[in-house]
Curated annotation (Swiss-Prot):
Its EC number is 6.3.5.-. NCBIfam families: gatB (TIGR00133), PRK05477.1-2 (NF004012), PRK05477.1-4 (NF004014). It comes from the Bacteria. SMART domains: GatB_Yqey (SM00845). It comes from Chlamydia abortus (strain DSM 27085 / S26/3) (Chlamydophila abortus). One of its GO terms (biological process) is translation. The keyword Protein biosynthesis applies. Belongs to the GatB/GatE family. GatB subfamily. The gene is gatB. Signal peptide: none annotated. Pfam families: GatB_N (PF02934), GatB_Yqey (PF02637). This is Aspartyl/glutamyl-tRNA(Asn/Gln) amidotransferase subunit B. Heterotrimer of A, B and C subunits. Allows the formation of correctly charged Asn-tRNA(Asn) or Gln-tRNA(Gln) through the transamidation of misacylated Asp-tRNA(Asn) or Glu-tRNA(Gln) in organisms which lack either or both of asparaginyl-tRNA or glutaminyl-tRNA synthetases. The reaction takes place in the presence of glutamine and ATP through an activated phospho-Asp-tRNA(Asn) or phospho-Glu-tRNA(Gln). It is an enzyme of class 6 (ligase).
Length: 487
């Protein structure tokens, strides 16, 4: 990156739209379900029929309150709905019902790890609103699918407290993990259950000025988010450098962009609207939403262990490396799998490495999640225990892991019974003979080792393991090799 760019910093905030996994929509009894035939999950309310009146979904409120408790925000005892007016084909009423002035949650924070450092990203608010429909384009015309119209959302608005793409991705990743843990959304980003609008401005380092921001709409990939933020950061810096004497407000006007992943650039959609352009006013067909402290406390007590708390526990209780703990807690199903396996295997570090490296790699190739692969946590625990007990070598364990992926119902013990030829080499006289052959075949390595080049020992061990097809116990190979070399 140019040194000129290094003199600037980004100021980033995120608005995240999260579809709540209720059975019905926010203000009607129409089904809330993705993937059905277009315009089958609709009602007079979500299609804006005259005379239809909204009725608030109680479960959506409960899920919004649960989120507020999870982020340690202030859940409002009194909140209110407003109309946000805009005209677009996917909005049949020509307004959205949202919470403009009195949101259900204010404040709170998302805990994340950025480059090994604990960070608390502050939230401004979270409010309840309904989603719009979807435009589907077919060549020269477009159709409107209102199945999504009226689906309950919470919009989570952060403060402008992030200063680089890594901050934003860490925040977004931690937020999705939190949503998954508390179970208020299916968090399927490919289906649009979580959509990120990213706001970014730039300023010279050391400045406290907040310049005009640009919004990049509907990011549904962490990788695209990082790319878009870096591209937009460079675009804005270039614009300011090209116009050093101009008023910053005229150099970068407030606008909405989208990310073009093929061209690797942000593309202008429209100039930014002002709040007054939406003509907000109180929703006349819904009463004030009134909650009680007892109701909020009841919901707070249903919170599970949250990902960041679990992360800290894994560091202390299991003594895991920070990066391994972060991988395990990122998905609640993977964390649960690890904890079940850890009940039967006390070599937690080896167990976690097998889960996050060996089995994770195999599952990725097959497009599976280990937690749903059919492999039992006890089977993975048994595999690691067998290595520690010297029943099998690491090479044999990898072969068994391959077989477990193909036959997930089989434990390592069962696989070894069915394939006794996989058992490690136990005939020490045969092993000593192989060691002698390797020593004879590699005289230079022997000379190197005896002259103090310790890497030569590793080479000799590798040759022995190759000759035994990985079936010789590595520790015993080392011991016997040293004995033979000392002769």
């Amino acid at each position: 990156m140019s040194d000129v760019y290094a003199d600037w910093e980004s100021v980033i905030g995120l608005e995240v739209h999260v579809e709540l996994n209720t059975k019905s929509k926010l203000f009607s009894c129409a089904r809330n379900r993705f993937g059905d035939e277009p315009n089958t999950n609709i009602s007079p309310v979500c299609t804006g029929m005259p005379g239809s009146l909204p009725v608030l979904n109680k479960e959506a409120v409960r899920k919004a309150v649960l989120f507020g408790c999870a982020v340690e925000g202030e859940v409002a005892l009194l909140s209110r709905f407003d109309r946000k007016s805009y005209f677009y084909p996917d909005s049949p009423r020509n307004f959205q019902i949202t919470q403009f002035e009195h949101p259900i949650v204010r404040g709170g924070h998302i805990k994340a790890i950025v480059h090994g450092e604990e960070r608390h990203f502050e939230l401004a608010q979270a409010h309840i609103e309904d989603d719009a429909g979807m435009l589907k384009h077919f060549g020269e015309f477009a159709g409107v699918d209102y199945n999504r119209a009226g689906v309950p959302l919470i919009e989570i608005v952060s403060k402008p407290c992030m200063f680089c793409a890594d901050d934003a991705v860490a925040y977004a990743t931690a937020l999705v993990s939190l949503l998954d843990y508390i179970g208020i959304s299916d968090c399927n980003m490919e289906e649009g259950s979580v959509r990120f609008d990213v706001n970014i401005s730039v300023r010279p380092k050391g400045s406290e000025e907040l310049r005009n921001k640009v919004e990049i709409k509907n990011m549904n990939s962490f990788a695209f988010m990082a790319q878009a933020l870096e591209a937009e950061r460079c675009r804005q810096i270039d614009a300011y450098l090209d116009n050093p004497n101009a008023d910053p407000k005229t150099v970068i006007p407030g606008a909405t962009y989208r990310w073009d992943p093929e061209k690797k650039k942000t593309v202008l959609m429209r100039l930014k609207e002002r709040a007054e352009d939406y003509k907000y006013f109180i929703e006349p067909d819904l009463p004030v939403l009134q909650l009680t402290e007892a109701y909020i406390d009841e919901i707070r007590h249903t919170l599970p262990e949250l990902p960041f708390n679990k992360y800290q526990r894994y560091l202390h209780e299991y003594a895991l490396a920070e990066d391994i703990a972060a991988i395990l807690i990122s998905d609640k199903h993977s964390a649960h799998f690890f904890e079940l396996a850890a009940q039967e295997c006390k070599n937690y570090r080896a167990l976690s490495n097998w889960l996050t490296v060996e089995f994770a790699g195999r599952c990725k190739l097959k497009g599976k999640n280990l937690a749903f692969s059919g492999i039992l946590p006890s089977s993975v625990a048994q595999l690691v225990n067998f290595i520690d007990q010297g029943v099998i070598t690491g090479k044999i364990a990898k072969d068994i892991a391959d077989m477990m992926m193909e036959s997930p119902e089989k434990s390592p013990e069962t696989i070894l019974k069915e394939n006794p030829e996989m058992l490690p080499m136990t005939d020490e006289s045969a092993l000593v003979a192989i060691i002698s052959e390797v020593i004879t075949a590699n005289p230079q390595s022997v000379v190197d080792y005896k002259s103090g080049k310790t890497k030569a020992l590793g080479f000799l061990v590798g040759q022995i393991m190759k000759r035994t097809q990985g079936k010789a116990p590595p520790n015993r190979v080392n011991e016997l090799l040293l004995v033979e070399l000392s002769k």
